[in-house]
């Protein structure tokens, strides 16, 4: 647009193209959606942590109830233990249910949702309290603990380390981004906008990498939570199986006890019935024998009862130790969970603040984009109005040029009979000059001797002489008239030539104006095409991202145009034909009327003369001139040819 015409549109948005601004805006929108997704992930992680805490508390209550049940259960009698062993032999299963630490620490495996596969056998002697920032603690596995006496040696443990210490880095990146945005907003020089946008892109890239790392960490934690949940379900199933086996064993022991009681009652009844027919001595002997048998059976049952009691005490001690370890692990997990909860709450607040700031930036950018769009629409309306004005001016100039061409042809048609009349008058003057020369030669010839008075020859000569004198006077008067006509015709022709030159100059000026308006119209059309292409690109970008509803601007809001239009020549009506009323020509042989000039012409006001061309061909030419075929607007070359035509 620069250097091509006076119509340069001022762009208040600087030299930044609209495509790059829209691309940066789309990047900001995508970053905003990504941050929203991350916020939702963090919320889901908090919900998972709450669920794991509830599950841990529930499992803790179940473990405490199991410990209470194991403490309150009384030791069984010797025959019941013997029958318990017999039941084991009958069923072929291990009825000695050992509630090892894996069952009691099921809560810890589900509660450690943020630690992953960190599993280790309990080490009660070497327990270090958690400091709230580390997430490593021991969990008793179910696969590697075969017996409670096989030592608690450490196994594979995956330490995730402290929670991500990248909050400070994120804060620094966000502070840098805020500083770059503030500098970009306060920067008066718009040429530095690309450098600021590059810095902003670098900061966004760094933030994206940090957030990607956090996403990876959260995904790892989610997978670990899922694994721990599965382990928790497996431990629950094992615990339920152990409880069912214990209930079945207790039921079988009760049944054996009732059967033994029945057998004892039957045996005592049989002994009583057998001892009745005998004497009292054998009865006393039988009683003594029964008492001895009972004492022997009691002494025999005391030995396995003492062994079972020792095993039960060992089990109780082991369960107590596991309960203490479980309480300690639960305390550590509580501390760690609280610290993690505080950290994630702090992160959530920071991310909410960042989201609010980014939303503010997005709204500001949206407002700027709307303002630029309005300015662009105003410029388009201004350019369209200017194009319409130029087109109207061009139409007026073409109409005026057409009128001037008609005027030139009309004057040409009027000039042709005048030239013919001039030729006729010149021939007549030549003839009269010849006749005058002959008359003068006759006068200058020597006169004959005077004849006698009254002779017929003298009278005829005298009459001839008088006729020649009168004819000479008449010829002199005609010559004067012809000279006057010739002088008038010459002055009229000179005046017509001057007017013709003036008309040529006016036609040249109008042609220059037409060429200038054509060039300006061409440049404006090119600008409009470029703006239409930009609009199409913008619409495509809007279709891929968010839609923008443009406000209509029907009115012309811009002020006066700062650049001046090229000066239009003052079209003053010519009054050069007012003196033509004094010219009196002799009547031509063929009187014909000529059509008057165009009545709507605002350039010339011709006097109402009755032009009478001598021939009929002129009428045909004038009719062709007055009704020309509609042609396209005159180009500079055709206008020059029209001007050079009437010579």
UniProtKB/Swiss-Prot annotation:
Annotated motif Nuclear localization signal, positions: 537-543
Listed Low complexity bias regions: 102-115
Chain intervals for the UniProt region annotation (Interaction with Nef): 95-425
GO cellular component: a single term: cytoplasm
Residue positions, PTM Phosphoserine: 77, 297, 416, 455, 638
Tissues of expression: Ubiquitous. Abundant in heart and skeletal muscle and expressed at lower levels in thymus, liver, kidney, brain and intestinal tract.
Asymmetric dimethylarginine modifications at: 584, 612
Region (Disordered) location: 61-168, 613-647
Disruption phenotype: Embryonic lethal. Mice develop an inflammatory disease with characteristics of human systemic lupus erythematosus (SLE), including the appearance of immature granulocytes in the peripheral blood and development of autoreactive antibodies and glomerulonephrititis.
UniProt cross-references to Gene3D superfamilies, sorted A to Z: Nemo cc2-lz domain - 1d5 darpin complex
Post-translational modification summary for this protein: Phosphorylation at Tyr-565 by SRC-family kinases recruits phosphoinositide-3-kinase (PI3K) PIK3CD:p85 heterodimer which results in integrin activation and leukocyte adhesion to activated endothelium during inflammation.
Renumbered residue ranges of the record's region Ubiquitin-binding domain (UBD): 465-523
Acidic residues bias locations: 637-647
Protein's UniProt keywords contain Cytoplasm: yes
Record-listed Phosphotyrosine modification sites: 565
Any GO molecular function: mitogen-activated protein kinase binding
Segments of skewed composition (Polar residues): 143-155
Compositionally biased region (Basic and acidic residues): 61-71
InterPro entries assigned to the protein according to its UniProt record, in alphabetical order: CC2-LZ_dom
PANTHER family per the UniProt record, alphabetical: TNFAIP3-INTERACTING PROTEIN 1, TNFAIP3-INTERACTING PROTEIN COILED COIL FAMILY MEMBER
Function: Inhibits NF-kappa-B activation and TNF-induced NF-kappa-B-dependent gene expression by regulating TAX1BP1 and A20/TNFAIP3-mediated deubiquitination of IKBKG; proposed to link A20/TNFAIP3 to ubiquitinated IKBKG. Involved in regulation of EGF-induced ERK1/ERK2 signaling pathway; blocks MAPK3/MAPK1 nuclear translocation and MAPK1-dependent transcription. Increases cell surface CD4(T4) antigen expression. Involved in the anti-inflammatory response of macrophages and positively regulates TLR-induced activation of CEBPB.
Protein name from the UniProt record: TNFAIP3-interacting protein 1
Gene that encodes it: Tnip1
